[in-house]
Amino acid sequence: MNRFLIAALLAPLPVLAQPAPQPMKLFTPGADIPALIAKAKADQKSPTINSVETIANVAPYQVLLEYRTGLTPPSVHRGQAELVYVIQGSATLAVGGHLTGVQPPRPGSASESGSGIEGATPQKLTQGDYAMVPPDTAHQFQDIKGEFVIMSVHLIMPEAKN
């Protein structure tokens, strides 16, 4: 009886331990983007870390502002395409090929990262450019000089029908 009672009381704990979902955010005025960039810049801990701020959010989708000042590891987003718009700066987007030194995804993440990327096609990106990374495709932002700020949206792709 005691075991049953303890099990019943502990059963909700994994649910309680989950992070709270972000509240829906339907609009961010363009005038607020410089403040989001400043916040991302202040939050950045290292040039190899991508600082992220939410522009808009309707689960399961987030429109993110990503702030980078250096090379970050290449990645593959399993089952997700990625739409990119360059807000500020320039970089080379390497797309395709394969990851080297693959690291398994973090728990709950659809993204794998690696230590390098081989066989990718380079595409220069500058302010105002758009790019789309297909699902399950290796990619990396390279040749970042100064600040590189993008808007990105990961798009969950429907399963292919055979």
Residue ranges, per PLM feature:
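Sec-dependent N-terminal signal peptides
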Residues: 4-14
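A short, N-terminal "cap"/entry segment at the start of jelly-roll beta-barrel domains
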Residues: 16-78, 161
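Extracytoplasmic
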Residues: 58-60, 78-81, 86-88, 136, ...
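His/acidic/aromatic-lined binding-pocket segments of jelly-roll/cupin-type domains
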Residues: 75, 82-85, 122-123, 130-131
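Short beta-strand segments in beta-sandwich/barrel cores
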Residues: 90-93
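Short acidic-glycine-tyrosine-enriched beta hairpin
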Residues: 98, 102-135
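Ligand-binding loop in jelly-roll beta-barrel domains
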Residues: 124-129, 136-158
